[in-house]
């Protein structure tokens, strides 16, 4: 039976919760499309987050890995296309670290692309009434750090897994503390993650559908 590892983060930047972990942990132990779902929390800390993820990858040997993170200000589930090899933190992480213009992996590739069927996921999410889009940037904070670290590990540690990253909006309770910022209900995010998992397990190839942006 396939194993799907889904990760979320602990809260950061003085938020009381992180919607990624609140949604992800709901799926732990469930069976989706014939696969076992395993969920784990990652620390919002440069370096340590990748080390924790690496240990999980080596012990679980999952078939699919979907990392999920909070993106306050976004209004949709953002299915990330690419991870870039740079840390450039606008704020400090949960350990007080704030790397600037630093390679995640010295001498590593400039970028890695998601191996999830990102456009098919967006298509299925929209069909189910969940706002979603392909995102062209995962930022340069710990989310991109983990996304890059995940894809680098898959490429270099002999893992036969597909992987990628999904950003999600604030929860409504969080958005109440950030007037004017969009949010997405917990149940909608959980349903969206189930769709993303199901679509990934069902499709080995992505669909051809416009998902780019002009700027």
Swiss-Prot record:
One of its GO terms (cellular component) is cytosol. The keyword Nuclease does not apply. Gene3D superfamilies: Peptidase C15, pyroglutamyl peptidase I-like (3.40.630.20). One of its GO terms (biological process) is proteolysis. Coiled coil: none annotated. Pfam families: Peptidase_C15. PROSITE patterns: PYRASE_CYS. This is Pyrrolidone-carboxylate peptidase 1.
């Amino acid at each position: 039976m396939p194993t799907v590892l889904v990760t979320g983060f602990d809260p950061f930047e003085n938020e009381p919760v992180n919607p990624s972990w609140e949604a992800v942990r709901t799926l732990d132990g469930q069976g989706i499309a014939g696969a076992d779902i395993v969920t784990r929390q990652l620390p919002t800390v440069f370096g340590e987050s990748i080390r924790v993820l690496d240990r999980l990858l080596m012990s679980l040997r999952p078939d699919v890995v979907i990392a999920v993170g909070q993106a306050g200000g976004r209004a949709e589930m953002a299915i990330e296309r690419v991870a870039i090899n740079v840390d450039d933190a606008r704020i400090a992480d949960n350990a007080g670290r704030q790397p600037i213009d630093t390679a995640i992996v010295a001498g590593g590739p400039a970028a890695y692309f998601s191996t999830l069927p990102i456009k098919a996921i967006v298509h299925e999410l929209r069909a189910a009434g969940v706002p979603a889009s392909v995102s062209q940037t995962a930022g340069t904070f710990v989310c991109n750090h983990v996304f890059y670290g995940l894809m680098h590990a898959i490429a270099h540690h002999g893992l036969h897994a597909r992987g990628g990253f999904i950003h999600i909006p604030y929860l409504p309770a969080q958005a109440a503390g950030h007037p004017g910022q969009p949010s997405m209900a917990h149940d909608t995010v959980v349903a969206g993650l189930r769709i993303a998992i199901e679509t990934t397990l069902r499709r080995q190839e992505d669909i051809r559908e416009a998902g780019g942006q002009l700027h």
